[in-house]
Amino acid sequence: MGNAELAGELRVTLSKLSRRLREQAHAADLTGAQKSALLRLERDGPATVTTLARAEGVRPQSMGATVGALESMGLLAGSPDPAD
């Protein structure tokens, strides 16, 4: 598979993921903070809670609560940070 073909498939996949996240965000009646965190993760990729909090301009404790709520809804799945 060439780079152009791979890039095309990646664009299609990301578009589908973006659409699904928007649909789920609406269906789940998420808070503004939850929607913002999901959209940032979609755009920027995986991040630690601390990094995400800094990017969103909130305290890590607040982002931890936001991420915890999203995990409990099944919209996020956390994994251990290898640098931790």
Regions inferred by a protein language model and the residue ranges of each:
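N-terminal leader segment of winged-helix/HTH proteins
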Residues: 1-32
